[in-house]
From Swiss-Prot:
Belongs to the histone H1/H5 family. CDD domains: H15 (cd00073). Pfam families: Linker_histone. GO terms for molecular function: double-stranded DNA binding; nucleosomal DNA binding; structural constituent of chromatin. Coiled coil: none annotated. Residues 159-197 have a biased composition (Basic residues). It comes from Caenorhabditis elegans. InterPro entries: H1/H5 (IPR005819), Histone_H1/H5_H15 (IPR005818), WH-like_DNA-bd_sf (IPR036388), WH_DNA-bd_sf (IPR036390). GO terms for biological process: body morphogenesis; chromosome condensation; egg-laying behavior; locomotion; multicellular organism growth; negative regulation of DNA recombination; nematode pharynx development; nucleosome assembly. This is Histone H1.X. SMART domains: H15. Residues 142-232 are annotated as: Disordered.
Length: 232
């Protein structure tokens, strides 16, 4: 009896091992992993509400928002394929309207039925809405910071613009001064030309004076000699 029971136990163990191997080889997981994110339809609606463009949100913007705010994993090509299929179904059903493009490409916005539900106050999703409030606050802070930046930049440009104008004025004044300095030597040269004949005449006057001085001693000497001769 004991030997037969041992054989039965070994046979049962072998059968269970074969069943478990077949189960794994066929690709059936032992337990399904719990999803850490809501459905793709809810995530798409949350992304469109957060982006809130009047003309619609592009698929790339929706995918970026989903990847940043939901735990969808790192396999973005797989997430993109799911997103495309859900967008096509939502456009066909009328939950989402396609403003531009065809198929899964283009821009999308909320459908009329979803907008009515939002106006009445029926929440489309529960968990992501809490995240959307935080995201909206961050977006508002970013938009405020972007609005304040242009004013500072404009002030800086104005402050920098004034010295440029003054430098231009200084450059013009320096050019004018240089032109005046260039004109000044010409005036001096003209003055020298005018003074030329005067110098010649003055030279003649000096020569005449010298001649008179030379002539005067001769007359004095003649007078002296004349007086001496008279005394003798």
């Amino acid at each position: 009896m004991t030997t037969s029971l041992i054989h039965m136990a070994n046979h049962l163990d072998a059968s269970t091992e074969e069943i478990s191997l077949n189960y794994v080889l066929l690709g059936h997981p032992h337990h399904e992993r719990a999803q850490h994110h809501p459905s793709y339809m809810d995530m798409i609606k949350g992304a469109i509400q957060a982006i809130d463009n009047g003309t619609g949100s592009s698929k790339a913007a929706i995918l970026k928002y989903i990847a940043q705010n939901y735990h969808v994993g790192e396999n973005l090509p797989k997430v993109n394929n799911h997103l495309r299929s859900v967008l096509k179904k939502a456009v066909d059903s009328g939950d989402i309207e396609q403003t531009r493009g065809h198929g899964a490409t283009g821009s999308f916005r909320m459908g009329k039925e979803c907008e009515k539900n939002l106006q009445v106050g029926i929440p489309v999703q529960t968990k992501p809405m809490l995240m959307l409030k935080e995201v909206r606050q961050k977006l508002e802070n970013i938009s405020k910071a972007e609005k304040t930046k242009p004013s500072t930049s404009s002030m800086s440009t104005n402050k920098k613009g004034k010295p440029i104008s003054t430098m231009k004025k200084r450059g013009v004044m320096s050019k004018k001064r240089s032109s005046k300095n260039k004109m000044a030597p010409k005036a001096k040269s003209h003055g020298l030309k005018k003074k030329g004949p005067a110098t010649k005449s003055s030279g003649l006057v000096h020569k005449a004076a010298g001649a008179k001085n030379e002539a005067a001693p001769t007359t004095k000497m003649e007078l002296r000699t004349g007086t001496r001769k008279s005394y003798c």
